């Protein structure tokens, strides 16, 4: 059985296979030709963290695949009242066909995968956001980027998105420049994994605290909010610490001609990205948001097909 907890669990060909499947599924959806790949299956959707895009895309996605989504907030189930994760996993695994969880701790996802007996998908954790990366990669591929030779600049907080970009780059082999302020760097354990993967993929990983150097000549520029869920008390300090990291017109002018800009949303204009840059690249950003639906449908179908491996 295969789970989808982090891109580090997949090899290059598996990532590309899921993206190819996503393109096929998207083409079917655009022609209103919905194929019931997961007919009568139930997806349990555990939400410790609230979300717009994750809930809508998974709930619509499983419906379009012929199944049903079951929304479970931490207030609705015993997991939010102190029940061990492994007990929740063993109960759900006897009643549903697949689990998607959007949680704080990556270890909770690993526990669900270990004890549930059904495929588990990471809808987001504090460490990784792999379904968002699949959406980003799908979007860039549709925009004509070569996923193995492109140059990507990530500017901002060293968070779950940064970690996921490092996993993607180190598996596929593209160049990734990561610019974070001092004190907000990528965890060393994540860098160690990425560097080890890069011995095979030959990915060029550049870590810096200079956002302009990172963006210079980049084919793709991406960022994320400076204040993630649960960090609201740090907002004022973070805004001060991230001074000089706003992706504005001056910053984008350093990138390659016709460079793309992505943002996983929600975006806070005037902070991590300027209003002008956001609106100039709104088509790319909202295609990226839509592609959460198609990429995640592909992930669910892939997990189902790998159920007995």
From Swiss-Prot:
NCBIfam families: orni_carb_tr, PRK00779.1. This is Ornithine carbamoyltransferase. One of its GO terms (cellular component) is cytoplasm. Pfam families: OTCace (PF00185), OTCace_N (PF02729). Its EC number is 2.1.3.3. PROSITE patterns: CARBAMOYLTRANSFERASE. It is found in: Cytoplasm. It is an enzyme of class 2 (transferase). The keyword Transmembrane helix does not apply. One of its GO terms (biological process) is L-arginine biosynthetic process. InterPro entries: Asp/Orn_carbamoyltranf_P-bd, Asp/Orn_carbamoylTrfase, Asp/Orn_carbamoylTrfase_sf, Asp_carbamoyltransf_Asp/Orn-bd, Orn/put_carbamltrans, OTCase_ArgI. It comes from Campylobacter fetus subsp. fetus (strain 82-40). GO terms for molecular function: amino acid binding; ornithine carbamoyltransferase activity. Carbamoyl phosphate binds at residues 51-54, 78, 102, 129-132, 264-265, 292. L-ornithine binds at residues 160, 224, 228-229.
């Amino acid at each position: 059985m295969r789970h989808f907890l982090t891109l580090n669990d997949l090899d290059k060909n598996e990532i590309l296979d899921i993206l190819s499947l996503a393109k096929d599924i998207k083409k079917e959806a655009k022609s209103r030709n919905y194929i019931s790949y997961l007919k009568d299956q139930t997806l349990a959707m555990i939400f410790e963290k609230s979300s717009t895009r994750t809930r809508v895309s998974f709930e619509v996605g499983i419906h379009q695949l012929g199944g049903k989504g079951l929304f479970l907030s931490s207030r609705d189930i015993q997991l939010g009242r102190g029940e061990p994760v492994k007990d929740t996993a063993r109960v759900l695994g006897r009643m549903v066909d697949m689990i998607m969880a959007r949680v704080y701790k990556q270890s909770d996802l690993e526990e669900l995968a270990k004890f549930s007996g059904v495929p588990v998908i990471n809808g987001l954790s504090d460490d990784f956001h792999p379904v968002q990366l699949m959406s980003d990669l799908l979007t860039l591929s549709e925009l004509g980027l070569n996923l193995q030779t492109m140059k990507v600049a990530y500017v901002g907080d060293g968070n779950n998105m940064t970690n996921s970009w490092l996993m993607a780059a180190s598996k596929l082999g593209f160049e990734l420049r990561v610019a974070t302020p001092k004190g907000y760097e990528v965890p060393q354990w994540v860098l160690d994994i990425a560097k080890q993967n890069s011995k095979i993929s030959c990915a060029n990983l550049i870590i810096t605290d200079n956002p302009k150097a990172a963006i210079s000549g980049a084919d793709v520029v991406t960022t994320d909010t400076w204040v993630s869920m649960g960090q609201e008390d740090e907002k004022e300090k973070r805004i001060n610490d991230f001074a000089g990291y706003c992706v504005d017109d001056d910053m984008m002018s350093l990138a390659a001609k016709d460079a793309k800009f992505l943002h996983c949303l929600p975006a806070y204009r005037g902070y991590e990205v300027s209003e002008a840059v956001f609106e100039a690249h709104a088509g790319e950003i909202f295609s990226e948001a839509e592609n959460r639906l198609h990429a995640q449908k592909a992930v669910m179908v892939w997990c189902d097909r790998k159920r007995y491996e």
